[in-house]
């Protein structure tokens, strides 16, 4: 009975051990996830800053009124649109980093 228990433990330990290729794939995925998160965080930071500037310009536009207010509203709208583009670009770059890692892993498995 004890022999079967030891044998079962050894079999489960062997099943849990990762090959060097699997470890390398895990490291690639982890690195890609981290790069993607960094990219998204940087894009969010830049976009938040632009949205804050847009909000400030909207407030100034409301106070200024007239043509000056209209100019400020146009600038605010442009900054808001730019912030959306920056977020989208960050998301796309993050997706590309993850897809690149997946492609590298698949290529290494096919060798």
List each model region and its residues.
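Sec-dependent signal peptide recognition
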Residues: 1-7
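Bacterial signal peptide processing site
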Residues: 16-19
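Juxtamembrane extracytosolic/periplasmic "stalk" immediately C-terminal to the first targeting helix
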Residues: 25-34, 55
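Intrinsically disordered, glycine/charged-rich N-terminal periplasmic/extracytoplasmic linker segments
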Residues: 38-41, 45-111
